[in-house]
Amino acid sequence: GPNGIGKTTLLKCMIGLLPWHSGKTLFYGKDIHTLKPKDVWSTISYIPQSRGFAFSYTGLEMVLLGRSAHLGTFQQPGKEEIEMAEAMMERVGITRLANKDCNRMSGGELQMVLIARALINEPKLIILDEPETGLDFHNQILVLNMVERLAHEEGISAIMNTHYPTNAMSVAAKH
């Protein structure tokens, strides 16, 4: 849809980051606002549209952030989480970005790191807010192929908003 129509707002309302004006989001039959955030975020991964970071993270550190919902409040990632993050980066094809500062990555590199961060959470649902924005054609194809593979081969449900109907149709379920 066009700019300013509310695509991002809709996604944020769906996952409880913004309130609905009326109605509610049901998550496994329960109002999402009545659930513990850890219960929600251990099942859903969200890749936001904005990509600026207040802190300097390496690719590996960014991917590790995806395990936060599975750790205690002050618990640091251990050897197991680091190995999971390294394996996820290998799976997504971005091991070369492990030590690169996210603020110095290209749009395509960062998007793949954010996808790896979302996947390490082992979600049942992944929500992508305009994942191809700012990417060149090659990186758009990489991201869209990854979304399609997640949905069709790995059974992860995906909700994606986009300005490009052709991109949406290329990864949509065709049942």
Where do the model's predicted regions map?
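H-loop/switch region of ABC-family ATPase nucleotide-binding domains
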Residues: 162-163
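Catalytic Walker B motif of ABC-type/P-loop ATPase nucleotide-binding domains
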Residues: 126-130
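Conserved catalytic motifs of ABC-family nucleotide-binding domains
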Residues: 122
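Helix-to-loop junction immediately C-terminal to a conserved catalytic motif
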Residues: 15
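Conserved ABC ATPase signature
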Residues: 101-105, 109
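Conserved ABC ATPase "signature" region
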Residues: 64, 79-97
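Conserved ABC transporter NBD signature motif
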Residues: 23-31, 40
